[in-house]
Amino acid sequence: MRSREPWRLPAGQSRAVPFLQAAVLFAALCIFARSAALVLAAFLAAPVPAAQTLLHLGQQAVESRAAESSAESAAEAASAPSPAQEAAAPVQTGVEQYFVALQPDEARPADAGTVTEQQFGQGSGEKYIPCGAGSIKNNTRQTAADIAAEAAQPLPFAIEKDSAAPQVLIMHTHATEDYRRSAGLWFTPGDGARSTDRSINMCAVGRVMTDTLNAAGICTLHDETLNDYPSYTGSYANSRAVVQQYLAQYPSIKVVLDVHRDAIERENGTRCAPVCTIDGRQAAQVMIICGCDNGTSVQLPAWRQNLRFAAAWERSMEAKYPGLTRPVLFSYRFYNQDLTTGSLLIEIGGHGNNLNEALYAGYLAAQGLVETLLG
């Protein structure tokens, strides 16, 4: 009977190669298992109204992991020498990594709606109170002197930098609000400027802001619950319940930002995009809305503290990025701003802006907020 020769590796191949391959595979499986466990734990611990958001984020994590794996495989394949290798595309950095492809003018329908651009100034007259390089538009019975004095006060809270405890919550009462899809100044007829797709609606802007704050050491949570879907009616009651449960679970939260977009439309149906240019790139303008207690229908006992925060953020943004802000709107609006002493609503552009302008504006607003909160 012929004796069997011992198994040998092919010439030039080390036994370490299959061992390393097995080790890499084992490590990848461990990382995936850990990610799945974290998503499950977060789902079980999170506020009930946010469960839908966590499921969505869990799916995003899986897709992201698959994309990373695919990218690694592609990188390995690309590393092999080729006779005519094309130049690699430039690596995107900063806010550009969030940008999306916009519709070209070739896709413009014959009956497309028109968009016009306008840069809004800080305003003048007795209604406008200077706030650093920015301003506050007073639509209340409070005197200009009272508002100016309050705006000069320090923040009513202190943010803990690099803390594991959440400091900021970003959410969206009208999460389905979205932006222009076209690169040119036109929009598709019948486009209601709303979408349940979180990659293009307000959740996309909130994600940029959240990432920017977290990168600066401000622990920030982002809730992506579609509070205005399937019904727009009751959206503020829905978002109030979400915020209350976050505050109960994370009492360390000092700031709650309700991130929206505006809708400026002319009588003839033309949509207006509030714009500015920052560092050579066009951005949507932003506007903070701060509510005031009117003693009857609008009960906001902490309106003074919220106003201090609004004024400080306005000053930081307009000083750092001249032209980015429209005047703070100080008015008898409720918007659930009774829940903390750092509750504000901010409009990031309007339905006339394209998504990339809004994403850039969200990034700039968050950078201004970092300076406001950390000094």
Where are these regions (language model features)?
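Active-site-adjacent mobile loop/cap segments within catalytic or ligand-binding domains
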Residues: 323-375
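Structural recognition of the beta-strand scaffold that forms the well-ordered cores
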Residues: 169-172, 220-222, 255-258, 287-290, ...
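N-terminal catalytic or cofactor-binding beta/alpha core of small enzyme domains
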Residues: 20-254, 263-268, 363, 371-375
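Solvent-exposed loop/turn segments at secondary-structure junctions
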Residues: 175-178, 226-230, 261-266, 293-296, ...
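A short, glycine/acidic-enriched catalytic loop
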Residues: 188-192, 264-299
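Active-site-adjacent substrate-binding region
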Residues: 302-329
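Alpha-helical scaffolding within the catalytic cores
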Residues: 240-243, 268-276, 328-334
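N-terminal Lys/Arg-rich, disordered targeting/topogenic segments
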Residues: 1-16
